[in-house]
C-alpha cells in the first residue's frame, strides 16, 4: 500500500509546531509515548458494543480486559464506587448524564458560558441548551468568583432538576459542599464537570467533588494528561430518585441509567484503542511522580499569575488555585481584543486562546481576554523561573501586536528556549 505522504507530512508539521512553541492553552497537554502507542494499536480494529462481559459482538474477551483495567484504575484514582470510561469526549459524557437525568424541556442550572462555563452546560448553540431549559448563575463582578448566593436564589426560583458545576475558564476551586446543600434544598441532583482540574484533584491538590456530587464527569486529557476522551463517575451508587425499574421490577441504580445513557443512548461502539490509552494514563496518574508533576503545574500557574499581575494585567478572580488563569486585557491594553492578542502570540509561537471575560462588552469572536494554562509547558519540564520569562515575552508581543519585527524576534527566542525542553519530560 502506498504511504500517504500528504497526511504524514502534515502530521510532522504539527509535531514541529508543538516542539518549537510554547503551549499555553489551558485545555491542552502532551501525552506519553505509551499513551500514544496504545491509541495507535490494533485495538482500533475491534467492535465492542456493550460493556465488559455483556457485549453484542464476539471476540471481545481481550478488550474486556483492557476496559476493565481502565475502570478499576479510574475508580482507585478518584475513590469512586463506579465509573464509565466509554464516552468519546467530555461533552459526550455530559450529554449522557443529561440524557439519563433530564427529559426534553426539563430545567437545569449551570455556570454562564461568558463567566467561565462550558458550551455543554446550557449554551443555546449546544444540544444542552436546545433540548433542555437552561438557566444560569454567574460570578460576582467585584471578585470574579462564583456567586453561590445567586446560585441558590436561581435554584429556589427555577427548581432545576439538575445543577451543574465546573467550567472551562474558572481559576478557583469550587465549594462542592455548598452546592450540594443548594441541590438538596430544591431536590436537584448535583453534577460536577471536573474536566479542567481533574489531574489536580487526582493528586489531592484540590477539593474532590466525588465527596458531594451525585455525578461527576471529566475529560481524560487536559490536566489528567491522557488521550482525548470522557469519563463518568459516581462516588457512591444510589437508586434513581424517579423510581425507574428493571423488567424484574427492581429500582434501577443510577449507574444502570448512566450506562444505558452512554450505550445505547448516545453512542454505539466504544473506542477500545482510546480506552486502552485511558487505562495507561490512569496507571501513570497512580504513580508517585504524578503528584510531583501536578504540584509543579499548580506552582507554575501561581508563578505565572504573579508575573502577569506584576506586569499590570488583571487576572479574573485575582489569581488562580489551579492550572489556569483568565486575563482581562482591558486593564493594560484597553483597545486590544483577545482575537488580535491570540493571533499575534500564535505568530510568535506562543499558543493561547481568546476568551470572553465576565461582563464582557465584546463578542465571543472578539473578546476582551485570553486564557492561559500551565499543564503542557509543565509536562515539558518547565519550572517557575521560566514562567516569568514567558510572561515577559507575551507582554512584548501584546505591546506591539502588529509589529512583524517584534513578533519575529520573540518567536526566535521562543524557539531557542524550547530546544532545551523535550515534549514529554516526566
From Swiss-Prot:
CDD domains, A to Z: SHMT
Reactions it catalyzes: (6R)-5,10-methylene-5,6,7,8-tetrahydrofolate + glycine + H2O = (6S)-5,6,7,8-tetrahydrofolate + L-serine
GO biological process, one term: tetrahydrofolate interconversion
Pfam families assigned: SHMT
InterPro entries per record: PyrdxlP-dep_Trfase (IPR015424), PyrdxlP-dep_Trfase_major (IPR015421), PyrdxlP-dep_Trfase_small (IPR015422), Ser_HO-MeTrfase (IPR001085), Ser_HO-MeTrfase-like (IPR049943), Ser_HO-MeTrfase_PLP_BS (IPR019798), SHMT-like_dom (IPR039429)
Enzyme class: transferase
UniProt-annotated site: Plays an important role in substrate specificity, residues: 221
Localisation per UniProt entry: Cytoplasm
GO molecular function terms noted in the UniProt entry: glycine hydroxymethyltransferase activity; pyridoxal phosphate binding
Modification N6-(pyridoxal phosphate)lysine occurs at: 222
Function: Catalyzes the reversible interconversion of serine and glycine with tetrahydrofolate (THF) serving as the one-carbon carrier. This reaction serves as the major source of one-carbon groups required for the biosynthesis of purines, thymidylate, methionine, and other important biomolecules. Also exhibits THF-independent aldolase activity toward beta-hydroxyamino acids, producing glycine and aldehydes, via a retro-aldol mechanism.
PANTHER family for the chain: SERINE HYDROXYMETHYLTRANSFERASE, SERINE HYDROXYMETHYLTRANSFERASE 1
Name by which UniProt lists this protein: Serine hydroxymethyltransferase
Organism encoding this protein: Parabacteroides distasonis (strain ATCC 8503 / DSM 20701 / CIP 104284 / JCM 5825 / NCTC 11152)
Amino acid at each position: 500500500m502506498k504511504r500517504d505522504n500528504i497526511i504524514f507530512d502534515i502530521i510532522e508539521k504539527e509535531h514541529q509546531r508543538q516542539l518549537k512553541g510554547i503551549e499555553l492553552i489551558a485545555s491542552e497537554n502532551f501525552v506519553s509515548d505509551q499513551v500514544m502507542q496504545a491509541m495507535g494499536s490494533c485495538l482500533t480494529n475491534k467492535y465492542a458494543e456493550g460493556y465488559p462481559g455483556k457485549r453484542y459482538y464476539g471476540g471481545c474477551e481481550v478488550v474486556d480486559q483492557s476496559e476493565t483495567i481502565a475502570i478499576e484504575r479510574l475508580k482507585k484514582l478518584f475513590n469512586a464506587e463506579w465509573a464509565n470510561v466509554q464516552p468519546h469526549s467530555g461533552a459526550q459524557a455530559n450529554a449522557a448524564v443529561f440524557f439519563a437525568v433530564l427529559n426534553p424541556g426539563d430545567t437545569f442550572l449551570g455556570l454562564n458560558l461568558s463567566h467561565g462555563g462550558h458550551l455543554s452546560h446550557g449554551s443555546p448553540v449546544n444540544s444542552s441548551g436546545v433540548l433542555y431549559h437552561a438557566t444560569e448563575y454567574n460570578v460576582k463582578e467585584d471578585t470574579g468568583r462564583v456567586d453561590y448566593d445567586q446560585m441558590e436564589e436561581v435554584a429556589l426560583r427555577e427548581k432545576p432538576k439538575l445543577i451543574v458545576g465546573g467550567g472551562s475558564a474558572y481559576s478557583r476551586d469550587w465549594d462542592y459542599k455548598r452546592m450540594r446543600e443548594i441541590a438538596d434544598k430544591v431536590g436537584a441532583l448535583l453534577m460536577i464537570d471536573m474536566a479542567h482540574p481533574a489531574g489536580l484533584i487526582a493528586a489531592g491538590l484540590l477539593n474532590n467533588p466525588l465527596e458531594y456530587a451525585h455525578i461527576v464527569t471529566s475529560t481524560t486529557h487536559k490536566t489528567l494528561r491522557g488521550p482525548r476522551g470522557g469519563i463518568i463517575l459516581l462516588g457512591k451508587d444510589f437508586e434513581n430518585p424517579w423510581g425507574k425499574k428493571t423488567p424484574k421490577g427492581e429500582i434501577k441504580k443510577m449507574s444502570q441509567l448512566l450506562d444505558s445513557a452512554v450505550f445505547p443512548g448516545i453512542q454505539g461502539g466504544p473506542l477500545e484503542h482510546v480506552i486502552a490509552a485511558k487505562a495507561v494514563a490512569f496507571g501513570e496518574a497512580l504513580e508517585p511522580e504524578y503528584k510531583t508533576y501536578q504540584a509543579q503545574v499548580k506552582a507554575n500557574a501561581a508563578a505565572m499569575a504573579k508575573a502577569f499581575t506584576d506586569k499590570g494585567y488583571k487576572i479574573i478572580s485575582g489569581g488562580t488555585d489551579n492550572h489556569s488563569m483568565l486575563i482581562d486585557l482591558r486593564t493594560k491594553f484597553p483597545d486590544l481584543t483577545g482575537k488580535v492578542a491570540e493571533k499575534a502570540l500564535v505568530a510568535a509561537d506562543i499558543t493561547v486562546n481568546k476568551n470572553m471575560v465576565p461582563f464582557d462588552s465584546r463578542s465571543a469572536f472578539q473578546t476582551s481576554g485570553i486564557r492561559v494554562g500551565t499543564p503542557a509547558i509543565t509536562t515539558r519540564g518547565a519550572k517557575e523561573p521560566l514562567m516569568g520569562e514567558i510572561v515577559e515575552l507575551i507582554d512584548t508581543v501584546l505591546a506591539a501586536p502588529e509589529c512583524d519585527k517584534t513578533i519575529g524576534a520573540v518567536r526566535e527566542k521562543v524557539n531557542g528556549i524550547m530546544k532545551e525542553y523535550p515534549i514529554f519530560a516526566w
